[in-house]
Amino acid sequence: MDVQETTAACRDAFAELASPACIHDPYPFMRWLREHDPVHRAASGLFLLSRHADIFWAFKATGDAFRGPAPGELARYFSRAATSPSLNLLASTLAMKDPPTHTRLRRLISRDFTMGQIDNLRPSIARIVAARLDGITPALERGEAVDLHREFALALPMLVFAELFGMPQDDMFELAAGIGTILEGLGPHASDPQLAAADAASARVQAYFGDLIQRKRTDPRRDIVSMLVGAHDDDADTLSDAELISMLWGMLLGGFVTTAASIDHAVLAMLAYPEQRHWLQADAARVRAFVEEVLRCDAPAMFSSIPRIAQRDIELGGVVIPKNADVRVLIASGNRDPDAFADPDRFDPARFYGTSPGMSTDGKIMLSFGHGIHFCLGAQLARVQLAESLPRIQARFPTLAFAGQPTREPSAFLRTFRTLPVRLHAQGS
């Protein structure tokens, strides 16, 4: 069998994604990958898929062609796996499990994390959105610049998770301060200092959730933690405390920084494409289309952080991925693949108008929440936060504009912001 030679010897995709040029704009490099090296083998031996069709297939094939790492196998990919609290927690999360364990855990949590139950949070989310916008209004009306990233995009998911988990807001702000640190420490090329910092933050989160679970067990309320503490399936199986902690840790990691980044990108789209703001002034279906296009254009997690292990030799595009190889998918690239989305670099909410969530009018799937058995449980929660925020920002601040150049965090994994300065412009200015 002829095997296409990749360009790993002269170009490592993960190193390139961490470069200043890619931090600023990764999409030209992703286009290069799709066209020249769509099944890329990095210097570390990891494989990275960049075409929509291959990524979509890999998502669907998880549990068949791919599996999660077996217990103890993380040491192949992370040298400190045996001693790292963060990596041990990662290994215990739902995202790392295969059927039948995955099936059992997913069933238990899905009973209390349905789309309908998340929709029931809309009034609370709307209240939080209104309060945060009230808080920044005086400064904006005085003509001052406001960092919308810090004052709104970061704060909203923190406060929503506090509501969801039934915990004090101040406690959530303290825990959330370490989430970005944990995520960077779990990257495929994280340094020892980054992993050590992640471990310290994870230990704090783990201890807090252990205490929270005990409080909910003795004094249950109408929140997701209380529901999970009492969750059981048809065999009266219950979640252990260790499973509960890893579940909550995984939910917070997967849904906090990424939601904040999506809010930032949505505001960026509002300001960069004023001709598209009309999508936020009409019915809910048009708002949903705007939200889906934001999620497609700028996936907050550019590639999958979870190792997917090939269960057999797999040939994609003339490249053989050997059995037991670690395969990751470049989600942000798949979302910009012209074979899936026409004119993919153009921001066009119409491509998602009147469709099922995540599906374009051409029947292609937006990849930011994954697909298949590991589809993101928090997808609806993120969508609701965006849908409740954007029309209110547009209505409250129709003259909102940039107050300076937004700055990004120097991350190869997360496409997130450090600052997003905005101010109000006088009408007609």
UniProtKB/Swiss-Prot annotation:
Q: Which cofactor does it need?
A: heme
- The UniProt transmembrane annotation reads none
Question: What keywords appear on the UniProt entry?
Answer: Heme, Iron, Metal-binding, Monooxygenase, Oxidoreductase
Q: Name one GO molecular function term.
A: heme binding
User: What is the superkingdom listed in this entry's lineage?
Assistant: Bacteria
Q: What is its EC number?
A: 1.14.14.-
The residues listed in the UniProt record as binding heme, with positions renumbered to this chain, are 376
Q: Which Pfam families match?
A: p450
Against InterPro entries, the record matches this protein to: Cyt_P450, Cyt_P450_B, Cyt_P450_CS, Cyt_P450_sf
Heme: is it a keyword of this entry?
Answer: yes
Enzyme group, top EC level? oxidoreductase
Q: What family does the entry list? A: Belongs to the cytochrome P450 family.
Q: What does this protein do?
A: Cytochromes P450 are a group of heme-thiolate monooxygenases. They oxidize a variety of structurally unrelated compounds, including steroids, fatty acids, and xenobiotics.
Q: What is the name of the protein in this document?
A: Cytochrome P450 BJ-3
Organism, per UniProt? Bradyrhizobium diazoefficiens (strain JCM 10833 / BCRC 13528 / IAM 13628 / NBRC 14792 / USDA 110)
